[in-house]
Amino acid sequence: MAAAAQTGKKKTVRPGEWKIWLLYAVGFVPAVWTFYLGASGNLGADPVKTFEHTLGLWALRFLILTLMVTPIRDLTGMAFLRYRRALGLLAFYYALMHFATYMVLDQGLNISAIVTDIVRRPFITIGMISLVLLVPLALTSNNWSIRKLGRRWNSLHKLVYVAIAGGAIHFIMSVKSWPAEPVIYAGIVSALLLWRLVRPHARNRKPVSRPRGEAMAVKK
């Protein structure tokens, strides 16, 4: 009887769930590899800044990939909705590591200096706001929160648009000149946000069924 009860309580594994865990594993490779390069003295003259920059860049990249899921589905019919939650959470983890690197390795946990930077340096202020906005999205990226919040969950997760815009602005303002890289990322982010604005008016297709439980992105 006990064995039967335990069997009945086993969690059902969804088909293809291993692909999501593989995405998480692959997603952390850049962080691990860059850390290894820094630890082995192969990140140039300023390894801390390079490590910090790389983590922030990957946070922005994963946010971009998160928002690309819907346009890809609209334009090609290819549905990657099951991976959207993982992509969004990877973006949050990288943003958190980016800030942790700044706090610990860059500022040496000097709270006074950190607070001063956040208050007085606009690009850090914007970056901090973007990180704070990602926190409730990460905390509610689960099926329980979707059921509990209902329609409010959709409204909450629209904050991802503000967060990614802030991330792009943070990137541009963090460089002293205007190299192509941050401008390109800002252009991609702008295109994705524009798509979200015009999509309700331009869409003229058969509705596509949407699986429940995909977080860190917004349903329209």
Swiss-Prot record:
Major localization class: membrane
Membrane topology according to the record: Multi-pass membrane protein
GO function terms (MF aspect): electron transfer activity; FMN binding; heme binding; metal ion binding; oxidoreductase activity, acting on diphenols and related substances as donors
One GO term (biological process): protein repair
Cofactor requirement: FMN; heme b
Cofactor note: Binds 1 FMN per subunit. Binds 1 heme b (iron(II)-protoporphyrin IX) group per subunit.
Claim: Transport is one of the keywords in the record: yes
InterPro entries: Fe3_Rdtase_TM_dom, MsrQ-like
Entry's transmembrane regions: 20-40, 52-72, 86-106, 122-142, 159-179
Keywords from the named record: Cell inner membrane, Cell membrane, Electron transport, Flavoprotein, FMN, Heme, Iron, Membrane, Metal-binding, Transmembrane, Transmembrane helix, Transport
Cellular localization per UniProt: Cell inner membrane
A Pfam family matched in the record: Ferric_reduct
Residues making up the signal peptide according to the UniProt record: none
GO cellular component: plasma membrane
Highest taxon above the source species: Bacteria
Job of this protein: Part of the MsrPQ system that repairs oxidized periplasmic proteins containing methionine sulfoxide residues (Met-O), using respiratory chain electrons. Thus protects these proteins from oxidative-stress damage caused by reactive species of oxygen and chlorine generated by the host defense mechanisms. MsrPQ is essential for the maintenance of envelope integrity under bleach stress, rescuing a wide series of structurally unrelated periplasmic proteins from methionine oxidation.
Family classification: Belongs to the MsrQ family.
Cross-referenced PANTHER family: PROTEIN-METHIONINE-SULFOXIDE REDUCTASE HEME-BINDING SUBUNIT MSRQ
Subunit-level organization: Heterodimer of a catalytic subunit (MsrP) and a heme-binding subunit (MsrQ).
Protein name listed in UniProt: Protein-methionine-sulfoxide reductase heme-binding subunit MsrQ
Organism: Brucella anthropi (strain ATCC 49188 / DSM 6882 / CCUG 24695 / JCM 21032 / LMG 3331 / NBRC 15819 / NCTC 12168 / Alc 37)
